[in-house]
Amino acid sequence: KDKLSNRVDIFIEEKAFSVTEASNFLEKIKSDFYITAHANQFTSGGLKVGVDNGAVSVDHLEVITDQEIDYLSKSDTTGVVLPGCSLGLGIPFAPARKLLDYNCKVSIASDWNPGSAPMGDLLMQASLLGSTEKLSNAEVLAGITCRAANALSLEDRGSLENGKIADMIGFKTNDFRDILYNQGKLKPSFICKRGKIYN
């Protein structure tokens, strides 16, 4: 009503909001908000609710069937995998390789929080996910740049293209592969925000 937010995030799980509760809630608010759903972390079922209600992203996906992956691949929803949660809770990673092989849009995020993902280094997490899931450097870097921007409804940034906002970070290296090879130890040498460089 007061336009304080343009996004809603709902956790769809047996011990949070049920599939029915989430469906009823999202049906009422989907015309006014971007939707993100945290789903399929421990049980399947929530992904379909998110996709059916036009979610921009569905996050987690550690527990997901082939049918759900196929359903996601035929939608505009970005699947966001959260390797920090898997590391923090000792559960398997979301099947990022299979998601990409099905042509799903896949982003990588940290879900940094004190309960299940207390490690905040996205590059370290993305590097470990890439090694475990057999992702290429390009797939991992896309997952934390352009696809991450899509998951946040920020299509005006995330890649270096004419007409897009020049938000980026730079690393002092002669080989872009060093960024992931160093698993978070290589730190940015500069930040560029809206075309302005900060050292």
Go through each PLM region and give its residues.
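Active-site-adjacent C-terminal substructures of enzyme catalytic domains
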Residues: 21, 44-159, 177, 183, ...
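C-terminal cap of metal-dependent C-N hydrolases
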Residues: 144-146, 162-199
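Structural signal for hydrophobic packing residues in well-ordered secondary-structure cores
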Residues: 1-2, 29-30, 148, 152, ...
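Receiver (REC) domain switch/active-site residues of two-component response regulators
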Residues: 6, 56, 167
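Metal-coordinating catalytic core of metallo-dependent amide/deamination hydrolases
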Residues: 1-45
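Generic beta-strand/beta-sheet core signal
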Residues: 11, 38-40, 80-82, 109, ...
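Hydrophobic anchor at the start of a short beta-strand
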Residues: 35, 106, 189
